[in-house]
Amino acid sequence: MGKIVLRLDRMMVERKMFLNELAERVGISNVNLSKIKNNKVTAVRFTTLAAICDALDCEAGDILEYQKDS
């Protein structure tokens, strides 16, 4: 089975936004956002995903990617 990964790093670079600023806008800690950014979590709440999309002015599909097993 494949997996879903978050590509926050690309969108953050495009938006010229640092981790601390995004964490503050989303309302979560730097540590938790770092775990999300580095795909070290197994689940993300839809409310958190929506807040990230609001802060980065993007759609969920812009930061979510499906990777097939190789």
Task: List where the protein language model places each region.
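A short, Lys/Arg-rich alpha-helix, primarily the initiator
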Residues: 1-17
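Short alpha-helical DNA-recognition segment
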Residues: 17-35
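Short C-terminal boundary/hinge segments that cap the last helix of small helical domains
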Residues: 57-70
